[in-house]
Amino acid sequence: WAAAYGLRLTTAERAKRESLSFLAGRGQAEVEALGRAFCREELIPRLYPQGVEELRKRHAEGAEVLLITASPTFYLEALKDELPIRRIIGTRMHVENGVYTGLIAGENCRGVQKPLRLAEDLAARGDMVDYAASWAYGDSAGDAPMLALCAHKVAVNPKKKLVRRMKGADGFSVVYWSK
């Protein structure tokens, strides 16, 4: 699936479904433990120090930090132990009777799904966002709908398609972070 996606022989949606199919038949507790270990051992060490500093800065300024991502949420919860992230909104996996089916529950949280999921989350909490004072960060064209909502739109090590799509938008900037 990875090679097929890299060669553009399949869609991002299908590649994601294939990459997550290994979860089928695994218990919820097992998957969540594997996810936390993956996050701690693989993901957190790879975070850009500038990104971590930026999140901490925004939090210190009083911002409520939300992670809105196409990634599956089962392995991201451990980020809350390291970063000032209040909530994670991402791709949900289908669980039936405590067992992962390997299927995505609903839609992949990318593109227009990001602002839709945020709106659902806010409505469920009776909460609001001041988009005129908000910051959003992204790296791909799938982040453009979320970036477009916020006054401060930051493309981090962006793919060219995102820069083309957002070029000229008020509040749009590009940054390059490294390890």
Residue ranges of each PLM-predicted region?
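C-terminal cap/substrate-recognition subdomain and adjoining C-terminal extension
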Residues: 28-29, 33-36, 40-179
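Electropositive phosphate-/nucleotide-binding environments in soluble metabolic enzymes
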Residues: 9, 13, 25, 111-115
